[in-house]
Structure formats: C-alpha cells, structure tokens
Amino acid sequence: MSINVKSVIEAALFIAGNEGVHKDKLKSISRLSVQDFEAVMEEMIFEYEKDPQRGLVVRKVGENYKLFTKPDISKIVASGFGIKQKNPLNQGMIETLAIIAYNHPCTRSQIHELRKTDPTPMLEKLIEIGLVEEAGRSEAVGKPYLYQVTPKFYDIFGLDSIKDLPEIVLPEQKIEELTYEEEINFFDTNREDNGDE
C-alpha cells in the first residue's frame, strides 16, 4: 500500500502537538532527501494556508514545524468550547515589546529612553506571560539587566527569527501596533527585580 508522505508528516505534527517537530526529525520520518523535504514542506505550508476547507495551518517556528488553528476558526471553536480569548497586551506593553524586539537585547534604561516612561510594570507583565526574558547583564556602569524576546514571541507572531520583523523607517516614530492573536492549539519568571537600574 502506497502512503502519501504528506499524510505521514501531518500525522507526525498532529501527534507532536504544541511542541512541534524539529525539521531534522521530520525529514527522517518522511524519509525524503533534504531538497525534497524542503519542497514538500513549502507545498504543505502553502496548501494548508490557502485551502478554505482546512482549519489548520502548518508553520515553521525556528527549527520546528507545527500545526496551528487558523485564527478565524480558532475563535469559533473557542466559543463552542466556552474558552474566552483575550488579548493580554495593552498599548504600553505592545510598545515595550516592540522596542525589545527591535533593539534586543536592551536594558530598562534604553526602553525608558525610547518610551519616555518607566517600563518596569510593562516588563514585569511581559516576563510573567512569557514574551520577554532576562538575557544576562550589560557591560555598562552598574551592569543592568538585559532583556530579549522569548521563543514564545516568535511562536505567537509567526516569526522564524528577528530578521522576519517588518522594517521601520525611524526608531523615533511610533512603532506600529503588533497584532497579538494567540492561536489556540486544540491538541493537546516572573521574578521581582527592583534593583535593575
């Protein structure tokens, strides 16, 4: 019996759930050459995205491939299951997150310089929900903490790396609001820091 390789890949992604499957592992499962595997994955990403009869999409996040629920379908299913979808980011958090993403890693004082307001409450919340993390200390006077975005940031915003961020013309201009719409997957640090600066 001939088995379609895309069906095998789909099943592997389904079983892996939220964790996804590393590209090397998935290639091994598919038994394809590197070139053929990359071509098949590009096809699957395109097909899942464009097919209106599919409720899922395939995405590459870092080195992993994962299945996600399409945003419009996610809302319907969430409503059916009684799951409330809520955007946890206010405008200040969005601006702080964007500054960190475009200037990573950066210190609290650097964020303050760009936003002209104390970023502490925003940082604490972003760390709590897992979008920002500490990245060591700066060599500047006082050795303040450095902050960077987390893998969850790339996951939620569908980015492979920082290079995939949209370009902005001038850092002084207000950074365009990012759309935070966490896709529910139906498969199955916070720390106190008052002495940063």
From Swiss-Prot:
Gene Ontology BP, a term: cell division
Stored InterPro entries: ScpB_csome_segregation (IPR005234), WH-like_DNA-bd_sf (IPR036388), WH_DNA-bd_sf (IPR036390)
Cellular compartments per GO CC: cytoplasm
SUPFAM superfamilies associated with the record: Winged helix' DNA-binding domain (SSF46785)
Record's keyword terms, sorted: Cell cycle, Cell division, Chromosome partition, Cytoplasm
Cellular localization per UniProt: Cytoplasm
Predominant cellular place of this UniProt entry's protein: cytoplasm
Top-rank lineage group of the source organism: Bacteria
Keyword Cell cycle found: yes
Pfam families named in the record: SMC_ScpB
Record note on quaternary structure: Homodimer. Homodimerization may be required to stabilize the binding of ScpA to the Smc head domains. Component of a cohesin-like complex composed of ScpA, ScpB and the Smc homodimer, in which ScpA and ScpB bind to the head domain of Smc. The presence of the three proteins is required for the association of the complex with DNA.
Main function: Participates in chromosomal partition during cell division. May act via the formation of a condensin-like complex containing Smc and ScpA that pull DNA away from mid-cell into both cell halves.
Family assignment from sequence similarity: Belongs to the ScpB family.
Record protein name field: Segregation and condensation protein B
Species: Malacoplasma penetrans (strain HF-2)
Organism classification: Bacteria, Bacillati, Mycoplasmatota, Mycoplasmoidales, Mycoplasmoidaceae
Gene giving rise to this polypeptide: scpB
